[in-house]
């Protein structure tokens, strides 16, 4: 065994290429779109204008693709992209269109968000009056 050298950490020698990661996030706007208070195509356009790549807006190139199927907006990224940043932009859109008081952004699962209405319980107020 004098010809072989032990490697630290048991990793293979040399630098290999990093595996290209593809991140895919969806935002489900079904409820507000069906009720007619929000336009999914307008939201898609907002994301295309506002998502920053390397500190610049409107710099999506081929790294980030935004697609819309009916009322679901999908953001596919080849570069590092935060799901939290997508939530931030969604909330910014809701605030801009005065929808922030009625809608909230909820994580449906690891890769998607959903726009839901706030639950307002009027039954509690009626019980307090008694």
Swiss-Prot record:
- Write out the similarity annotation: Belongs to the eukaryotic ribosomal protein eL22 family.
Q: What is the lineage of its organism?
A: Eukaryota, Metazoa, Echinodermata, Eleutherozoa, Echinozoa
Under InterPro entries, the record lists: Ribosomal_eL22 (IPR002671), Ribosomal_eL22_sf (IPR038526)
Q: Name one GO cellular component term.
A: ribonucleoprotein complex
Q: What is this protein called?
A: Large ribosomal subunit protein eL22
Organism, by scientific name, is Tripneustes gratilla
| An individual GO BP term | cytoplasmic translation
Look up the domain of life of the source: Eukaryota
Per the record, which residues fall in region Disordered? 1-21
- Gene behind this protein: RPL22
Q: Which UniProt keywords apply?
A: Ribonucleoprotein, Ribosomal protein
Any one GO molecular-function label of the UniProt entry: structural constituent of ribosome
